[in-house]
Structures are given as C-alpha cells and as structure tokens.
Amino acid sequence: MSSQPKPRVAVVFGGRSSEHAISCVTAAGVLAALDGDVYDVVPIGITTTGRWVLVEDPARFELTDGALPEVPATGTPVGLPLDVDTKALQRLGGAPGAPALAELGEVDVVLPLLHGPFGEDGTLQGLLELSDTRYVGSGVLASAAGMDKQVMKLLLAGQGLPVGPWTSFRARRWDTDRDGVVAEVEALGYPVFVKPARAGSSIGITRVTSREGLAAAVAEAVSHDPKVVVEAALVGREIECGVLEDLDGGEPLTSLPGEVEVVGGHDFYDFEAKYLDSGNVRLTCPADLPDDVVAAVRRTAVRVFEAMGAEGLARVDLFVDPARGEDGIVVNEINTMPGFTPFSMYPRMWAATGVDYPELVHRLIQLALRRPTGLR
C-alpha cells in the first residue's frame, strides 16, 4: 500500500521592505521547526530587489552577533504557477542548453513569512490568489487593512472597539499645510508617537515630546512611507495577545497575554530593543494580570481579529490599565503576520498557553490546507 504523499510547503521570506532581515530570521526559525517527515519543504527567498530564488542553506539566516541576514541573489530563480490548472513552481533559466522554463513540482501551500510592505500588506496574498494557491494567514483585504494603521483604526473604531486618540496626514500636506498638521498633532497633547502608517517592527517610529522634535520625526516617518500616523502616548501596560483560528471552525483561540516592559536604554519598544538589545527589555509570558482582565484582553483580541476579517493568525497589541478592568483596555494594533522568530512574543505566548513552536507552525499549515481557494 502506497503511503500518502507529504504536503509540499513553500516557505517564502525576505522581500523588498525594510523588514527584510527580520523576515529572514523568522524563516530560519520556522524552517528548523518544520518536520521533514511530515512536510516536503521548499525554501524561497525574495531578494531586496524582488528576485525570487531557491535557498540552499536556511540556517545562514539565523540572527548571530547582531548581524542582520539578507537573501542572496545567487540562487536559482523561481516563479509561481503559470495558471490555476497547475500548482507547479517554475524554474526560470538554467544551465546552458537547459530549458529556459522548467517545472519544479507542485506546491500545496505557501507559508509567507514576509513583514511589512510588498509582502504582509496584501500584495503577496493577491499574487497567490491569482494563481489559486493556498497560503497561511489573512487574505488580501485583512492583510492590507492590518498593515495600514490609519485604515485599521478607522475599521476598529467603526466596530466599537476602543482606539486611542490619533491623527494622520500625508507628506504633501505636511509640505503645504504644516501649521494645520501641527495644530492637529498638538490637540493630542505631547508626548506623541510619529509613525509610518505602513511599516512594522517599530521601524521609523519616533517619540516626540515637543514641537521642536516634530519635523525630524515626520522626516524619519516619511522616509519609510508618505502616509504618517501620529498617536497620543497612552498610559498603561503594554500587553499582547495571540489569536489562532480553530482547526474545527469554532471561535478563534487566544493565548495567555504577554507583557512588554522596556527597563532601560530605550524610550519605547523600538527596533533595536526588539531584535538587537534584548537585555533592556523584559518579556513576561503570561502577564501578571487579574483573571478578569486576562479574560477581557482575550475577548477583545477575538473581537479585533473578527472585526478585521483576519484568518489564520494574528497578534493583537493593547494598552491596559488593570485598575479599570475592561474599561482600561485600548487597542493599539493588529499584526496579521506577527514576528515569528522562536524568541518573538507570538510563539512565546502560545508556548505559555501549551502550544509549542513546531506545533504552532503545524497548525497554521493545516489551517491553510483546509481553507478553500477563491472567494470565501
């Protein structure tokens, strides 16, 4: 009796965004966790210029000594299936005399581990939808809305979820109506956080305490995105909660909440604190919160997940004042492809809840394999 073939999983990582290196680090952890006896794994890196290549040595992408990895352009170029009737990856080019285009075998599901624009924002998801390819995570709309802090806040507020005070503007308005923008920002009250609307990993974010620091902060944000979001600084503990779709189709599952505390060296939980200077950050899983607040955080995380139409997984970030119970919860954002390195908060929260890293990856792939293609 022949054995059932192993599902073939294309793990896609890297990409054109400023979060390229973090995506590579995520991929190193996920590829090490995938069980080769269960899945046939195809690692595909996307270079910083958008070239898709087969990757031969995924271990090279681990974060060591603070050095940030990058997908090399030297691998075999690959492309997605040519139409919806075949699921075969395509090898582009080859040795002299070899066919210019050759099939590399069918893929059952894509695990996209890209962070930021051109990957997490619905663009890659749309490409996979065009080729009728199953993939892990949220679809085009939820991915795009979750990446755009302005759109996300509008959607969440429209569903009655608590969102902190904020404003948004584009670079051209900063150039033509600076006084108007400054007035809107100062109505929030200092300090504020100035952010690129469509970036993650705390890239391009500045904490501003007075008008004098505003121009430099806007310039930093605009260097990453012409759309800028400014948020009032909120009082409360920085709490995160993982959400995972239920394999049996029930209500989304939630992890025990975790807490982020910056204990020195940084004004807030910025890129360096997240990835390069963990000694000044305390990540606590589970967070030390009263039971009723934990329950309220988990309920809120599910509401956010469903309001955004998210699928597969997400991390919901909140500010919590435990003394005020459920009234002390404010939603900061949703991440539809959260940091997924073995030391990232999302897998750590699930480990504290009883789902270890390999099992978490396995569940996500199984969810994608069961999900229909096309409109759903």
Swiss-Prot record:
Major localization class: cytoplasm
Domain ATP-grasp: 153-366
Pathway: Cell wall biogenesis; peptidoglycan biosynthesis
InterPro entries: ATP-grasp, ATP_grasp_subdomain_1, D-Ala_lig_Van_CS, D_ala_D_ala, Dala_Dala_lig_C, Dala_Dala_lig_N, PreATP-grasp_dom_sf
Residues the entry annotates as binding Mg(2+) 2: 333, 335
SUPFAM superfamilies xref list: Glutathione synthetase ATP-binding domain-like, PreATP-grasp domain
GO BP annotations listed: cell wall organization; peptidoglycan biosynthetic process; regulation of cell shape
Keyword tRNA-binding among UniProt keywords: no
Function: Cell wall formation.
Family: Belongs to the D-alanine--D-alanine ligase family.
Protein name in UniProt: D-alanine--D-alanine ligase
